[in-house]
Each structure stands twice: as structure tokens, then as C-alpha cells.
Amino acid sequence: MNIYAVGGAIRDELLGMPVQDRDYVVVGATPEQMIAQGFRPVGKDFPVFLHPDTQEEYALARTERKTSAGYHGFQFFYAPDVTLEDDLARRDLTINAMAREVTPDGALIGPVIDPFNGREDLEHRVFRHVSDAFLEDPVRILRVARFSARFADFSVAPETLALMRKMVEAGEVDALVPERVWQEVSRGLMEKKPSRMFEVLRDCGALARVLPEIDALYGVPQRADYHPEVDTGVHVMMVVDHAAAQNYALAVRFAALTHDLGKATTPEDVLPRHIGHEGRSVDLLKPLCERLRVPNECRDLALLVAREHGNIHRVMETKAAGLVRLFERSDALRKPARFAEALQACEADARGRLGFEANAYPQAERLRQALVAARAVDAGAVAKSYENSPAEIKDAVHRERVRAVAKALNEAPSGQA
């Protein structure tokens, strides 16, 4: 029995990056031998075991064969005579198909085992498939795109990109289940440069299949005085990358990605203006979230930002009454943390423009100050003073909040948005 650390741990070690998790492959063992040594079986489709002390996963060396469409359609084969190279050959990219032997307690020993020249591809910053078996698993398209967001200076080998395009044309991507698409897209959004993920998906044609709403934004012009980058798709990628650079949460990054969906459906005769695109964005975003089964937290923030980002951008001219109405529409009085995330997405939107990247965004501070004042109003006390006129309570609380906001901003309470 020989044990090897494989995959990402070896890749990251060679890149000088911290190794978060290790995957282990066991060669020359049977399930019975693993159990006899105290390992606990947990795998459903193939033998995976938890180490009795570290609880790390150890898998028996295996090969796989495609049996049907999609990423579930595989049959696995494992036996003591399956070699390490057999196991590495089924992996997606050469940079993930390297190994090092380890001792039973997990200490690395011996040289890097690299049968597919992954080390050379690491040095040249290239994503290259191990074999034509890459064609059999459409998730690998999403993984290459996600790795591109993590390792932004890597390129996809031309022959690998050609395989990815072939898979898209064959409809393999269409067999992906929504949860897996969301899993990979959300992980890519949390990488250093998410725009690279969407660039790779677009290059191979997969973006139009998995996120047609994003693909449709490319080539849609915007007013050059507001958007020197002009292309809406380029703008959205700048917004997402800004959100990533600020280390914002996933919900903020997803809102940044989807805030301008409605610009793709702007009538051509009114371009490059996009009047009413906020409402159209909401209409497109709802079915997108349903289709990908986006978590409620991400969906709700994205809908809020899509609907209100234009109003938030204009708040420097908005009076106290309009600010309070914005808070009421956005449920900011009950959910200030979510509203704070909406401001992050809007700031990313404002800065995700060519030449605007370092500009101040005073709208955020104005709204934060106003929200503190509005939330400080004791709605219960106001309600008590109107206990004989309950129908008037809502308007009375609103008026008190307007007065409080106006005072905080040193403005008159009258005025509209």
C-alpha cells in the first residue's frame, strides 16, 4: 500500500501558495484493508475513507468511464492493481495531475511525480487538459473558468479551448444541473478576478448556455460620458472585479454581476440610453435566480440592487422625504446590514467604469448618516401618541423619520426625491 498527496495541494505547493486541504490517493489497497487500519468508509460512488485521526479523505486509486450525458454519467473502477498514473490520467488539468508520496501520518516524502508535465505548464502559466477524457465531464469547463479567476495570469491552451468549444457545441453543458452551475459560478465569484471566469466561459461559448443574461450584455452600448468603457458587458466585469478587490461578500458580488441585466433588452432606437433598465433587470433576474436556485440571501440583495441602484446613485440630490421612502422600499430600517451591502454593490457600480476607479462615492456616507437618524426614531413612542387614531400611525412615524433625517443632514424636512 502506497499513499500519495495529489492534485491542488501539489500545485499550490509548487506555486508557493498556502495549502488549505490535501487530497490523498491510496494505491495497492482494498476497502477491507483500509477498514482494518481504522479508516471509515464514506464514499457512495467509489471508495473514499476518513483517516482515523485527522478525518482527512483518502480515496482508492480508480479509473472512470463515461456511461451517459452530464457529470453524473460515470462508472468507476477500482482495484489494487490500478496505478497512480492511471488515477492521475483521469484528472482534468495537467497542473492538477501531480503527486507526492506521503508517510502514513501524512508527511510528504520523495519527489514530485509528474507524468503529464504539469510542472512545465505551471511554469508557463497554462491550463492544459490531461487527455481527451476531458470531453466526458462538462463540469470541467466550469472548473477551468473558475481556475482562471483564481490564477488570472494563466491562459487556456488552444487545444483545451478547442475541446471546451466542442463540448458546448455537443450540448454537454446543457446537461449540468443548476446546483452545480451555481456552485462553480459562486466559487468563481469569490476568486481574485472573477471577470476571467466569465471571459473563459464566453470564449468557449458556455456563457450563452449557463448565463445567457450575462452573455447578452456584451456589445450593448452605454453613454460614453457616463461609461467611457461603453460596452455594458465590459462595465459589469469591471464592477465585479472591483467588488472582488474590496473583498466583498458573495451576495454583494452576485448583485454586482446582475445589477444591469435589463440593459440587454433596451430597444435599439433609444440606445445608448437605458431608461427603465432597473425594472427590466428585476424581471430578468427573478427567473435567473429560480433557474440556478440561487440562495435567498444572494437573490434578495441582487433584486434590491437591480431595482434601486439608480436611485441610490442620485441621492446627493434627494431630500429627506425621498431618502426615507428609499429606506422603506428597501426594508433598510429592519435590515440595515443588507442595505449596507447594497451600498457596497452600488459603490462598485460607480467605480467599475473606465477612469472612475478611484473616485469617491459620497452617496454611501449620506445614506449611512440618514439611515442612522431614521432608525433612531422611537416608532413605539410615536404610535403611543396616536393610540386613539391608529390609522394615522404609519404616516406619523414616516413624518418623524423625515424630520430626523433632515435634522441629521442639516436640511429642511420638506422636499421630494
Curated annotation (Swiss-Prot):
Domain remarks in the Swiss-Prot or TrEMBL record: Comprises two domains: an N-terminal domain containing the nucleotidyltransferase activity and a C-terminal HD domain associated with both phosphodiesterase and phosphatase activities.
Organism: Paraburkholderia phymatum (strain DSM 17167 / CIP 108236 / LMG 21445 / STM815) (Burkholderia phymatum)
Cofactor binding note from Swiss-Prot or TrEMBL: Magnesium is required for nucleotidyltransferase activity.
Cofactor field: Mg(2+); Ni(2+)
Reactions this protein catalyses: a tRNA precursor + 2 CTP + ATP = a tRNA with a 3' CCA end + 3 diphosphate; a tRNA with a 3' CCA end + 2 CTP + ATP = a tRNA with a 3' CCACCA end + 3 diphosphate
Residues reported in the UniProt entry to bind Mg(2+): D21, D23
Full protein name: Multifunctional CCA protein
Binding residues for ATP: G8, R11, R91, R143, R146
Listed GO MF terms: ATP binding; CCA tRNA nucleotidyltransferase activity; cyclic-nucleotide phosphodiesterase activity; magnesium ion binding; phosphatase activity; tRNA binding
UniProt function note: Catalyzes the addition and repair of the essential 3'-terminal CCA sequence in tRNAs without using a nucleic acid template. Adds these three nucleotides in the order of C, C, and A to the tRNA nucleotide-73, using CTP and ATP as substrates and producing inorganic pyrophosphate. tRNA 3'-terminal CCA addition is required both for tRNA processing and repair. Also involved in tRNA surveillance by mediating tandem CCA addition to generate a CCACCA at the 3' terminus of unstable tRNAs. While stable tRNAs receive only 3'-terminal CCA, unstable tRNAs are marked with CCACCA and rapidly degraded.
Record key words, sorted: ATP-binding, Hydrolase, Magnesium, Metal-binding, Multifunctional enzyme, Nickel, Nucleotide-binding, Nucleotidyltransferase, RNA repair, RNA-binding, Transferase, tRNA processing
EC number(s) recorded for this UniProt protein: 2.7.7.72, 3.1.3.-, 3.1.4.-
Gene name linked to the record: cca
GO BP annotation list: RNA repair; tRNA 3'-terminal CCA addition
Pfam families in the cross-refs: HD, PolyA_pol, PolyA_pol_RNAbd
Xref: Gene3D superfamilies: Beta Polymerase, domain 2, cca-adding enzyme, domain 2
Residues at which CTP binds: G8, R11, R91, R143, R146
Misc. comment: A single active site specifically recognizes both ATP and CTP and is responsible for their addition.
Annotated HD domain residues: 232-333
Family under the similarity heading: Belongs to the tRNA nucleotidyltransferase/poly(A) polymerase family. Bacterial CCA-adding enzyme type 1 subfamily.
Subunit structure, as described in the record: Monomer. Can also form homodimers and oligomers.
Calcium listed as a keyword: no
